[in-house]
């Protein structure tokens, strides 16, 4: 019979106790470091909240820095970006005039919306051989008939409007109650004939000054306006006197159907103006955002309108711009506020566009609204 040394059991028990104490101490130190220094600043969510913090407070400077230090979207997990953005909502937003003016000066040099957003008789004279944006080998000869459709000059000038709202169609708008705030803007841009019926007005408003129309909508929903002219006209009437904006010279397929829009409105004696994006403006805007990391086959119409608004308006507010399946609180949302139809994969770079908007918000250049509104 072997003799069992009781001291060996005591040594083993002692070693286990020391190991357990070490693990607990390590866990406690790690937890304290996370609370005191961690990126999420857990104490923010539990301290007594007395309302929005001032824009230039130390807390808000730190929160904005947390967004701006993320140079590319792939640097952080999506949930981490959401946490940082959600924390920043504790801060009042204010326009940084020097940052905004510097950014607008850059846009003026590269793109110049007040002179080239639309084709006009001034920037596209009679006889011009106009190059398409995408079909660069294609040329459209500006004849007398088309020339008469163009306005003599741009109808808008630099910083003409004090406060503008650019309204995207994202599901983030659903239940936002932002309609009154959107309607309170001096000028409102909307994308691609979105529904603004009574069912949606509390969230998206009704005021519209410019609405874009993608020619693919005309082709698919209105049979290229070869027969369905009155239904198309009735849809446009919803936007009252809003100007209609089309990419007629994006590619050769867009031109005829875009020109038909002008004919339809003339036939029904509509007061609505019809404008066409200048293809060189679209090229310049795409190049500019490519330099900031937006790599896509085509930038979105929303991004084009935001770019133009930054030159035409003193203060720009974005609504309905969000490119993720969840809102900042982690709740799943539909792709659009009116349906859940997904976009063609790989065509736009929406997450990259939204990421740039969050940066511009943090720099005080524009304001991105992703929560509920409490206007007026």
Curated annotation (Swiss-Prot):
Catalytic activity: a ganglioside GQ1c (d18:1(4E)) + CMP-N-acetyl-beta-neuraminate = a ganglioside GP1c (d18:1(4E)) + CMP + H(+)
Family matches, as InterPro entries: Glyco_trans_29, Glycosyltr_29_Sialyltrsf, GT29-like_sf, Sialyl_trans
Domain of life of the native organism: Eukaryota
Biological-process GO terms, alphabetical: glycosphingolipid biosynthetic process; N-glycan processing; oligosaccharide metabolic process; protein glycosylation
Stretches assigned to the Lumenal side: 39-376
Residues in the Cytoplasmic compartment per record: 1-17
Pathway annotation from the record: Protein modification; protein glycosylation
Any one cellular-component term (Gene Ontology): Golgi membrane
Entry keywords, A to Z: Disulfide bond, Glycoprotein, Glycosyltransferase, Golgi apparatus, Lipid metabolism, Membrane, Signal-anchor, Transferase, Transmembrane, Transmembrane helix
Primary site of residence: Golgi
EC number in record: 2.4.99.-
Pfam families linked to this entry: Glyco_transf_29
Active site: 348
Disulphide-bonded residues: 164-313, 178-373
Name used for this protein in its record: Alpha-2,8-sialyltransferase 8E
């Amino acid at each position: 019979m072997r003799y069992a040394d009781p001291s060996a059991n005591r040594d083993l028990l002692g070693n286990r106790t020391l190991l357990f104490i070490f693990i607990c101490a390590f866990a406690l130190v790690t937890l304290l470091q996370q609370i005191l220094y961690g990126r999420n600043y857990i104490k923010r969510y539990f301290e007594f909240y007395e309302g929005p913090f001032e824009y230039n407070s130390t807390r808000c400077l730190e929160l904005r820095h947390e967004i701006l230090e993320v140079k590319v979207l792939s640097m952080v997990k999506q949930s981490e970006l959401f946490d940082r953005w959600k924390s920043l909502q504790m801060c009042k937003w204010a326009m940084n005039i020097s940052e905004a003016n510097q950014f607008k000066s850059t846009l003026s040099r590269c793109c110049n919306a007040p002179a080239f957003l639309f084709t006009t008789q001034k920037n596209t004279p009679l006889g011009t051989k106009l190059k398409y944006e995408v079909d660069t080998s294609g040329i459209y000869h500006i004849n007398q008939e088309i020339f008469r459709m163009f306005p003599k000059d741009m109808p808008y000038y630099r910083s003409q409007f004090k406060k503008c709202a650019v309204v995207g169609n994202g599901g983030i708008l659903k239940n936002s109650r932002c309609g009154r705030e959107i309607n309170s803007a001096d000028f409102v841009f909307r994308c691609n004939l979105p529904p603004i019926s009574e069912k949606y007005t509390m969230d998206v408003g009704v005021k519209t000054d410019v609405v874009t129309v993608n020619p693919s909508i005309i082709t698919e929903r209105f049979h290229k306006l070869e027969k369905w002219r009155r239904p198309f006209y009735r849809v446009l009437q919803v936007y009252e006197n809003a100007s209609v904006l089309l990419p007629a010279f994006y590619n050769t397929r867009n031109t005829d159907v875009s020109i038909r829009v002008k004919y339809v409105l003339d036939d029904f004696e509509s007061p609505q103006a019809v404008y066409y994006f200048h293809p060189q403006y679209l090229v310049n805007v795409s190049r500019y955002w490519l330099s900031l990391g937006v790599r896509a086959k085509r930038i979105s119409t929303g991004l084009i309108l935001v770019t133009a608004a930054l030159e035409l308006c003193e203060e720009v507010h974005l609504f309905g711009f969000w490119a993720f399946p969840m809102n900042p609180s982690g709740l799943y949302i539909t792709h659009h506020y009116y349906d859940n139809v997904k976009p063609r994969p790989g065509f736009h770079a929406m997450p990259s566009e939204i990421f740039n908007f969050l940066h511009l918000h943090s720099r005080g250049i524009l304001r991105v609204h992703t929560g509920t509104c409490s206007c007026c």
